[in-house]
């Protein structure tokens, strides 16, 4: 099985992140006007936002707002890679999505290397983040 197929089928994995319980409660209250979750799903190395397509489709069908940006130098934006593109660029990419879309109470999900990216985004945009989720991702340690 290819890596992209594994991640595309990971919608079940996201349910284990606590969204299933929250979704059930929100689905029951949907007719009462309850808000749904806002998620920003950040891809790992060698991928692009497209890797979340099936997961995002499922979450949107449940009424959630889902964003799947592609970081500079990755996926369909690989042509933008260069010596100045790095972690800070990726943090800025995602932070700009939050700012330009005026997103608040965001559940920020990172896969693989983007665990480091979402940590930087959470530090930079802490007032916009509800929580961060490390989905089979690198988790930075204090002092390293």
PLM segments and residue spans:
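Active-site signature of alpha/beta-hydrolase-fold catalytic machinery across serine-
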Residues: 54, 120-124
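Residue in the alpha/beta-hydrolase core beta-strand immediately N-terminal to the catalytic nucleophile
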Residues: 107, 131-133
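N-terminal export signals
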Residues: 5-26
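Glycine-rich His-Gly loop
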Residues: 42-45, 112, 137
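Flexible "cap/lid" loop of the alpha/beta hydrolase fold
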Residues: 133-144
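Active-site loop/oxyanion-hole signature of alpha/beta-hydrolase fold enzymes
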Residues: 65, 71-107, 123-124
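Gly/Ala-rich beta-loop-alpha elbow adjacent to hydrolase catalytic centers
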Residues: 110, 114, 118
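Conserved HGGG/HGGXW glycine-rich cap/lid loop of the alpha/beta-hydrolase fold
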Residues: 37-76
């Amino acid at each position: 099985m290819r890596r992209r197929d594994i991640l595309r089928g990971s919608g079940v994995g996201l349910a284990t992140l606590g969204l299933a319980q929250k979704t059930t409660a929100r689905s029951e209250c949907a007719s009462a006007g309850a808000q749904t979750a806002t998620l920003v799903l950040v891809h790992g190395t060698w991928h692009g936002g497209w890797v979340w397509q099936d997961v995002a489709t499922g979450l949107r069908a449940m009424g959630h707002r889902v964003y799947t940006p592609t970081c500079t130098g990755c996926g369909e934006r690989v042509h933008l890679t260069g010596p100045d593109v790095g972690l800070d660029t990726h943090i800025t990419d995602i932070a700009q999505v939050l700012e330009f879309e005026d997103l608040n109470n965001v559940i920020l999900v990172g896969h693989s290397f983007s665990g480091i990216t979402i940590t930087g985004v959470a530090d930079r945009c802490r007032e916009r983040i509800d929580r961060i989720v490390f989905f089979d991702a690198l988790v930075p340690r204090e002092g390293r």
